[in-house]
């Protein structure tokens, strides 16, 4: 396999994600129509050169080197394809805010995998890229929907293979995501969780997940209300999110069917009917404002096509 010519450019667009949705801890996630865009360019130099230039929506520019997740993912592609690494530049337009529970790390991993693979004319299958993504991230609930799109349930089977189920999301159910101007790292959110949980809590979550998935499939409001409930992680994580429980209560009082921490937080996901969306959004922002936290709460649609790439120039 030959090294791509200098100047070849690939554009990769990767959606944000909301994970867990309450009871689906570390196994359920949905892609949302908020995106990070990556432009990969083959540049002069050896495989130890990786230039990462990031531009956020607030106009700030940041740089990252070989320690960045994008580069680590690209390295995995080179290793799996038995390819000598080559110099790359990645320019990133950041719309997915980091450390907010919207899968920003997953976008970096997925983009690095797809970009490095595409610039070499895709020697690795999508299945292999999924395997690598889960291995790098350590859990599947963000990277799988980020790559594939839609609502995805991912579990390791008795044969230790990852099994992915594309679940249905009824058109009548809308998502409002309240995104605060505060950060919470996934590692910090995991530290507060117990190593062991009561069997009764595990059983409760299994039942709730079944109700939620059926509610999302059929649009049954009662099933969503009863199923968007968690005993495994949220009871321990709410205390890390300033004003979080007040925001949840405000959303429910404004007509939300259910409310959950998005991923590890601090963003909060509310599911509702379209006609209640504006009230839910305004109530969540106001509740956080009363706790001294600035936020925004946009409507975000479930994105069904996953990550996409295109060749800008070169062969």
Curated annotation (Swiss-Prot):
It catalyses: L-homoserine + ATP = O-phospho-L-homoserine + ADP + H(+). SUPFAM superfamilies: GHMP Kinase, C-terminal domain (SSF55060), Ribosomal protein S5 domain 2-like (SSF54211). Keywords: Amino-acid biosynthesis, ATP-binding, Cytoplasm, Kinase, Nucleotide-binding, Threonine biosynthesis, Transferase. Pathway: Amino-acid biosynthesis; L-threonine biosynthesis; L-threonine from L-aspartate: step 4/5. One of its GO terms (cellular component) is cytoplasm. It is found in: Cytoplasm. Its EC number is 2.7.1.39. ATP binds at residues 97-107. GO terms for biological process: threonine biosynthetic process. GO terms for molecular function: ATP binding; homoserine kinase activity. It is an enzyme of class 2 (transferase). NCBIfam families: PRK01212.1-4, thrB. Belongs to the GHMP kinase family. Homoserine kinase subfamily. HAMAP family: Homoser_kinase (MF_00384). Catalyzes the ATP-dependent phosphorylation of L-homoserine to L-homoserine phosphate. This is Homoserine kinase. It comes from Prochlorococcus marinus (strain MIT 9301). The lineage of its organism: Bacteria, Bacillati, Cyanobacteriota, Cyanophyceae, Synechococcales.
């Amino acid at each position: 396999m030959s090294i791509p010519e200098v100047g070849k450019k690939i554009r990769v667009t990767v959606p944000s994600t909301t994970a867990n949705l309450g009871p689906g801890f570390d196994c359920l996630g949905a892609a949302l129509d908020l995106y990070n865009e990556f432009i990969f360019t083959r540049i002069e130099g050896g495989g130890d050169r990786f230039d990462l230039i990031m531009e956020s929506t607030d106009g700030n520019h940041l740089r990252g080197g070989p320690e960045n997740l994008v580069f680590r993912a690209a390295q995995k592609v080179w290793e799996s394809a038995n390819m000598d690494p080559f110099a790359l530049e990645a320019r990133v337009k950041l719309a997915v805010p980091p450390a907010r529970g919207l899968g920003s790390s997953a976008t970096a991993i997925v983009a690095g995998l797809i970009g490095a693979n595409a610039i070499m004319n895709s020697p690795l299958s999508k299945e292999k890229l999924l395997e690598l993504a889960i291995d790098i991230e350590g859990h599947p609930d963000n990277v799988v929907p980020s790559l594939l799109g839609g609502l995805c349930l991912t579990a390791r089977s008795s044969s230790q293979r990852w099994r992915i189920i594309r679940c249905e999301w009824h058109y009548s159910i809308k998502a409002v995501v309240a995104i605060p101007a505060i950060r919470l790292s996934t590692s910090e959110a995991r530290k507060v969780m117990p190593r062991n949980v009561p069997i009764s809590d595990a059983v409760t979550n299994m039942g709730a997940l079944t109700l939620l998935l059926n509610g999302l499939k059929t649009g049954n409001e009662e099933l969503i209300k009863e199923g968007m409930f968690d005993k495994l992680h949220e009871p321990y994580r709410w205390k890390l999110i300033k004003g979080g429980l007040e925001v949840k209560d405000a959303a429910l009082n404004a007509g939300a069917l259910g409310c959950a921490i998005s991923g590890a937080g601090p963003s909060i996901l509310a599911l509702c009917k379209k006609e209640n969306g504006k009230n839910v959004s305004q109530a969540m922002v106001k509740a956080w404002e009363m706790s001294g936290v600035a936020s925004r709460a946009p409507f975000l649609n479930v994105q069904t096509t996953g990550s996409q790439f295109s060749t800008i120039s070169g062969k």
